[in-house]
Design a protein with these regions (language model features):
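Structural/interface elements that position substrates and couple domains in central-metabolism enzymes
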Residues: 1-417
Length: 417
């Protein structure tokens, strides 16, 4: 099984690195995205996201002619769908419309012998749904859900499991779970990924592969929820949670995670709801963990309100408009520029709403603020240290660990100050 060309649908934080790594192995890669600006940037050999070493690989792949980007799908031997799977509205129901749109984009150029892989983190059954959408669009081709191993098109699910900031290494080194709709589909998918994957490609079926990714992130979410709930308990009991966790973790079989302002990102804050949406009666612990982590930003905001009140009491000559609040960090985790599902971003936004004084935002990994924060000021952390009265640490970026505000009231959600 040899693949000389590949199309990657979706050139975001997962799609672009995946496309670039395949292209670095001298496979002709066509990247497809609806964002014309991203397409133009990539075709110049540049990148529109922040990921260490990605720029070097993309530049080389484009320069050598192995990677190009376009807004219209083209024929290829294999297709990887790496598009978002957000929620529908506020009810935590998975929205598969991006996957459906990807199917509509590639169906006209599908040909007998093609492999289609869904990489997007998805609820159980999404790969089968994708296969059905493709079958409906191309009745002239056969698909594995009806023709088993004899199908014209092979379909599989292979969830990504990489850490932002380490994507280029982990894409290559990490094990991959590969779930074909049939065994032959799995074999074709393994052959494709073995182009660059040095980790083990573990074969299962599509539904189990989908559930594996959701399980990994739900497990992490539950453990984070324990730490976050513990931090709120300790606050009530006047106990230093950071010291407590250090002591408890001296037990050889205890490994409590570090609490924070909530849980963010496009995986841990989202994936557990995909399980809950399918099995609401059974997923009680998973739902509760999500609710605990989703409640933590409000707890942090209450701490900020108390800090402002304490400052006002200590400075009776000032009004709230005179009080300056600095928020340190907007990304969903340290040392990246990804603001998706970020509790820090949500907290900063709510502080801007409730506080009528100056709000300074410090995020060393972005050059500009999203539109919903445009009324705030993006500043260097030295400026915030000097000007702010209330210092709210939300993300433990390396830059923030090296220094600490010398005056004002500190609200530290990460325990580094």
């Amino acid at each position: 099984m040899k693949f000389s060309s590949l199309s990657v649908i979706g050139l975001g934080y997962i799609g672009l690195p995946t496309a670039a790594v395949f292209a670095s192995r001298k496979i002709k890669v066509i990247g497809v995205d609806v964002n014309q600006k991203a397409v133009d940037t990539i075709n110049q050999g540049k990148i529109h996201i922040v990921e260490p070493d990605l720029d070097i690989v993309v530049h080389a792949a484009v320069t050598e002619g192995f990677l190009k980007a376009t807004t219209v799908a083209e024929a290829a031997d294999a297709f990887i769908v790496a598009v978002p799977t957000p929620f529908k509205g506020d009810n935590h129901e998975p929205d598969l419309s991006y996957i459906q749109a990807a199917c509509q984009a590639i169906s006209p150029v599908l040909a007998k012998g093609n492999l289609v892989i869904l990489e997007s983190t998805s609820p159980v059954g999404a790969t089968e749904q994708m296969a059905q959408w493709l079958a409906d669009a191309r009745p002239d081709l056969t698909f594995p859900q009806t023709h088993d191993e004899q199908s014209d098109i092979r379909i599989a699910h292979c969830p990504e499991r990489v850490l932002p900031g380490h994507v280029m290494r982990e894409l290559i080194e990490n094990d991959r779970v590969i779930g074909g709709i049939t065994a032959r589909c799995s074999d074709y998918a393994v052959a494709l990924y073995k182009t660059f994957v040095q980790g083990e490609c573990v074969i299962t079926n599509a539904r189990t592969a989908e559930m594996a990714k959701l399980t990994e992130n739900s497990f992490r979410d539950v453990n984070i929820a324990f730490a976050n709930e513990l931090s709120m308990i300790c606050d009530k009991l006047d106990i230093n949670v950071w010291e407590l966790i250090k002591l408890a973790n001296r037990h050889p079989r205890v490994n409590i995670l570090q609490p924070g302002p909530g849980v963010g990102g496009h995986c841990i804050a989202v994936d557990p709801w995909f399980i809950v949406s399918k099995t609401p009666e059974q997923a009680r612990l998973i739902r509760t963990a999500r609710e605990v982590n989703d409640s933590k930003p409000e707890w942090v905001i209450n701490k900020v309100k108390i800090a402002i009140a304490d400052f006002m009491q200590a400075n009776p000559d000032k009004t709230t408009k005179d009080v300056s609040v600095a928020c340190y960090g907007l990304a969903f985790k340290p040392d990246i520029d990804d603001l998706r599902e970020s509790p820090a971003l949500s907290i900063a936004q709510q502080i801007m709403t409730l506080h009528n004084g100056a709000v300074l935002l410090v995020e060393p990994n972005v050059q500009s603020l999203p539109a919903k924060l445009s009324s705030a000021e993006l500043v260097e952390f030295e400026t915030a240290f000097a000007q702010a009265d209330i210092h709210v640490l939300l993300v433990d970026h390396k830059a923030f660990k090296a220094a600490k505000p010398s005056h004002g009231i500190i609200v530290d959600s990460k325990g580094i100050w």
